[in-house]
Amino acid sequence: TLVFQPSKEILEQNFKKLCSYGILDCSIYSASFNSKEISRITFATIGSVKNHPELFTHFKNIIVDECHLVNPKEGMYKDFFDAVKCKVLGLTATPYRLSSSRDFGSMLKFITRTKPHVFSEVIYVNPIRYGLLGEAGLLFNESFRVE
């Protein structure tokens, strides 16, 4: 599995987190880390792999963190996905895109409703429901308890 991260910092954080679970068959392919290792699970930034899709055609799956940043019409991600031809799973906490039309002006569209689209279906949505205002003035969602 190839795992795309939007930045060097998030790549490092997620790589270390996976390793902390005892999964050691993972590597980093990123110019920012001076590391170009490919293993069963490879963490990468699109900028580091965009010119070398042939190295990743054996992967069956790609996971894209912050997938709302993927341009479905053109760009590095689209070119890479077209070249490697495997399943792509996108993860995001922002499943909407701002789009505009001459008739309706600016509007938010769910990521699977844009045309053309990279992501064709939504597997799971966890809506945030805001609850109580905590003592620190922070707004907690219902998964946190204010004591």
Where are these regions (language model features)?
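Post-DEXD/H (motif II) to motif III coupling segment of the RecA-like Helicase ATP-binding lobe
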Residues: 60, 68-139
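Walker B catalytic carboxylates
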Residues: 65
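Conserved interdomain hinge at the start of the Helicase C-terminal
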Residues: 147
